[in-house]
Amino acid sequence: MQVLVRDNNVDQALRALKKKMQREGIFREMKLRRNYEKPSEKRAREKAEAIRRARKLLRKRLEREGY
């Protein structure tokens, strides 16, 4: 991953790098890989995340339609 440093502005380049890493999901991946996760725990977590996403989508849909 590359970030251009313009006019020796390292702070701005660092912010751009963090934003790129956030968009790519690198921080989340690092957090998940920090400890070993058993396959059964991984399936349970992914299932819970899918349910959460579905509920959120349904809530947004209902809010938009005005129910």
Curated annotation (Swiss-Prot):
Disulfide bonds: none annotated. The keyword Ribonucleoprotein applies. Pfam families: Ribosomal_S21 (PF01165). It comes from the Bacteria. Keywords: Ribonucleoprotein, Ribosomal protein. InterPro entries: Ribosomal_bS21 (IPR001911), Ribosomal_bS21_CS (IPR018278), Ribosomal_bS21_sf (IPR038380). HAMAP family: Ribosomal_bS21. Belongs to the bacterial ribosomal protein bS21 family. PANTHER family: MITOCHONDRIAL 28S RIBOSOMAL PROTEIN S21, SMALL RIBOSOMAL SUBUNIT PROTEIN BS21M. This is Small ribosomal subunit protein bS21. The lineage of its organism: Bacteria, Pseudomonadati, Pseudomonadota, Alphaproteobacteria, Rhodospirillales.
